[in-house]
Regions:
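Hydrophobic/aromatic-enriched cytosolic interaction surfaces used to assemble or bind macromolecules
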Residues: 1-161
Length: 161
């Protein structure tokens, strides 16, 4: 069983760099497209770090007495005036005490590409790499600064912007 951590590039969701448990995550490997991961099997895990600048994150406490659909509707209602695009252009997700907003076109394209692989896939915003609830953290990774906040939200900015 091998684990790979792929950090997608800022704007091209099919390119980036990855690290592998084969060498204890020491080597930086570039990839272009997902062909690099086609040989992974069901025992392997691919952790995909999506650039946080492409993911809106908001604190949101789900009500365990309500269904997932009702919680999602409540989340959308809470934040719809805070997002710059139309609600219908986005995908909304809830994880633990946070809600996430991702451009639907990017999300579906990435999901379609990743579903071709045979391994277990975990998709996270890149700021999760150094997330610790209750603490604010700034991390430099590749050409980005990652900001993780004490409430579990975060973002990233390109070093050159």
């Amino acid at each position: 069983m091998k684990t790979y951590v792929a950090h997608l590039s800022n704007f091209n969701l099919s390119d980036g760099i990855y690290y592998s448990s084969k060498d204890n995550y020491k080597s930086i490997n570039k990839f272009s497209g997902l062909k690099e991961f086609e040989n992974l099997d069901h025992k392997d895990t691919l952790i995909v770090l999506l650039p946080s600048m492409l993911v809106g994150s908001f604190p949101f406490k789900s009500n365990e007495k309500l269904s997932q659909q009702v919680n999602l509707a409540n989340f959308i209602s809470d934040i719809d005036s805070d997002i710059p695009s139309e609600v219908s252009q986005n995908e909304f997700l809830i994880y633990k005490n946070n809600g996430f907003v991702v451009n639907k076109k990017h999300y579906k394209s990435l999901n379609n590409d990743l579903s071709q692989l045979r391994c277990k896939i975990l998709l996270f915003p890149d700021y999760f790499i150094n997330l610790e609830h209750g603490k604010n953290r700034i991390t430099e990774l590749n050409e980005s600064f990652l900001f993780s906040y004490e409430n579990g939200t975060g973002t990233s900015v390109d070093k050159n912007s």
